[in-house]
Every structure is written in C-alpha cells, then in structure tokens.
Amino acid sequence: MKHKSGFVSIIGYPNAGKSTLVNALVGEKLSIVNAKVQTTRDRILGIYNSENYQIVFSDTPGIIDPKYKLQKKMMSYVMSSFVDSDLVVYVFDSSTNKNIVGKIKDILLELKVPLLIVINKIDLINQQKVEDIMKSLKSDFLDSYLSLIHI
C-alpha cells in the first residue's frame, strides 16, 4: 500500500483555539496553550502518523495587523504556511465574531488551497448566533471552502 502525506496549516486570530486543536489532533501537548495573546510566535509543526498516511500540522501565530518588526515576522510565518499547504484550517472564534481580514482571505482565494472552516467555542453562544455565523462565513468564502464545522 502506498504511504500518503499532507501538510495542513491551522490559522485564525489569537486565542481562537489553534494550538489546542493541533494538540488534540497530534495527541500530545506540542503547542503552548495560554490566555496570553501571541504565545505562538513561530510555526510549530506537529505530525500525526498512521500506518497508511502522515499529516504534518502547522500551528501558526494568531493573525494580527502587524505594528512592529516581530509582529511582521510572525505574520510572514502565517503567509508562508499557505504556500506549503495541501489544506488550510481556519479556526474561527465564535465568541469574538472577528472574521479574517481581506488580505489573507484574498491570498487563500488566489492560491486555491482547500479551506476547512472550524467554528470554535460554540458553547459560549446561542444556537441562533451559530447559524448566523455559518451563514456569514458561507457568504464570505462562497465556493472556496471544503467544509464548515463547529466544535
């Protein structure tokens, strides 16, 4: 049987749950999880191995509008992760309702990388708000996403 592998970038705003998701997917505490913003400053790679496949997850810094050199470097890690990806997972924090900025959305659409949208923290909002968010995200990304799930 042929062994398959793929690269998955996890993106989203700070504290959206990206590192928690990566830790859960690889089955160990690889990325630091902290309430402090910008705990993840570099790309952190986590690998999930199976008998027939391997998935390399890239936990990226939270998406921000960079104000100084370190933040610009952190955003370059996010941008470079798109190029290497077979799939981008966008973790959307439903408790803040902040959607990704136009520049990043435009890059995703331009690269035509498949997009999986994960709506996180739905336990903090009501069902109507979940439905409104799903409708808004579907409208924003039209045909560019593979699937939209909530956790």
List the model feature ranges, each with a label:
Residues M74, L108, I133-L137:
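Short, hinge-like loop/turn segments at secondary-structure boundaries
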Residues L21, H150-I151:
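Adenylate-forming
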Residues L111-P114:
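A short helix->loop->beta-strand "cap" motif at the edges of active sites that frequently abuts
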Residues M1-K67, K72:
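Conserved G1/Walker A P-loop phosphate-binding module
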Residues Q38-R43, P61-D84, S94-I107:
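Switch II of P-loop NTPase G domains
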